């Protein structure tokens, strides 16, 4: 079983902002695999389903970004999911819009949501999918909580489909195969 987590902030104010790439990715995965994310629990919203024969839990923590680890660890503990089967999807300002990077482990790289997950799991060793949102052109907070331009939004729609394919590959063929196939791919 896999726990697929998309990071973001709850509420209409944050919908489709750069910082909510994880939520958008989870919604895209859910739509493709007919998984309803309508259950309340684990300090978030989640849904259970199947991706290519593998059981998955899709989770959107509603703790706000900086406390995401609380939600992740609750779900992981409840379902007894190993860290290697927790996939976290989130925005990355060091990657251009339209680029993704998959990692098996690593530091938080300044991302507060990841910092909190590392803290709660007591480990940096969980796979993640970083989705490029571009370098800030203004104040960091305003930038990540801002929406994409119309041109960027077109790329993001495409990248969300690629993220879905990457997660499918991670679940079925393993993280290393997904890294080989999707890292370096740019729209």
From Swiss-Prot:
TRNA binds at residues 14, 64, 66, 112. InterPro entries: Pept_tRNA_hydro, Pept_tRNA_hydro_CS, Pept_tRNA_hydro_sf. It is found in: Cytoplasm. The record marks 91 as: Stabilizes the basic form of H active site to accept a proton. Its main location: cytoplasm. PROSITE patterns: PEPT_TRNA_HYDROL_1, PEPT_TRNA_HYDROL_2. The keyword Nucleotide-binding does not apply. Keywords: Cytoplasm, Hydrolase, RNA-binding, tRNA-binding. It catalyses: an N-acyl-L-alpha-aminoacyl-tRNA + H2O = an N-acyl-L-amino acid + a tRNA + H(+). GO terms for biological process: protein quality control for misfolded or incompletely synthesized proteins; rescue of stalled ribosome. The active site is at residue 19. GO terms for molecular function: peptidyl-tRNA hydrolase activity; tRNA binding. The keyword Protein biosynthesis does not apply. Gene3D superfamilies: Peptidyl-tRNA hydrolase (3.40.50.1470). The record marks 9 as: Discriminates between blocked and unblocked aminoacyl-tRNA. Its EC number is 3.1.1.29. It comes from the Bacteria. CDD domains: PTH. Monomer. NCBIfam families: pth. PANTHER family: PEPTIDYL-TRNA HYDROLASE. Hydrolyzes ribosome-free peptidyl-tRNAs (with 1 or more amino acids incorporated), which drop off the ribosome during protein synthesis, or as a result of ribosome stalling. Catalyzes the release of premature peptidyl moieties from peptidyl-tRNA molecules trapped in stalled 50S ribosomal subunits, and thus maintains levels of free tRNAs and 50S ribosomes. Belongs to the PTH family. This is Peptidyl-tRNA hydrolase. The lineage of its organism: Bacteria, Bacillati, Bacillota, Clostridia, Eubacteriales.
């Amino acid at each position: 079983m896999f726990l697929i987590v998309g990071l973001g902030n709850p509420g209409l104010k944050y919908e489709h902002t750069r910082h909510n790439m994880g939520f958008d990715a989870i919604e895209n995965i859910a739509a493709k695999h007919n998984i309803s994310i309508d259950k309340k629990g684990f300090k978030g919203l989640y849904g259970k389903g199947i991706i290519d024969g593998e059981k998955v839990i899709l989770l959107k923590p509603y703790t706000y970004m900086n406390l995401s680890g609380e939600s992740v660890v609750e779900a992981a503990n409840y379902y007894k999911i190993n860290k290697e089967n927790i996939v976290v999807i989130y925005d990355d300002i060091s990657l251009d819009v339209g680029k993704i990077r998959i990692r098996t482990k690593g530091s938080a790289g300044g991302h507060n949501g990841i910092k909190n997950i590392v803290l709660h799991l007591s480990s940096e060793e969980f796979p993640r999918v970083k989705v490029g949102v571009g370098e800030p052109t203004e104040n960091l907070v305003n930038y990540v909580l801002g929406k994409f331009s119309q041109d960027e939004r077109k790329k993001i729609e495409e990248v969300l489909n690629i993220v879905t394919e990457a997660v499918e590959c991670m679940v079925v063929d393993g993280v290393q195969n997904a890294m080989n196939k999707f890292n370096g791919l740019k729209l």
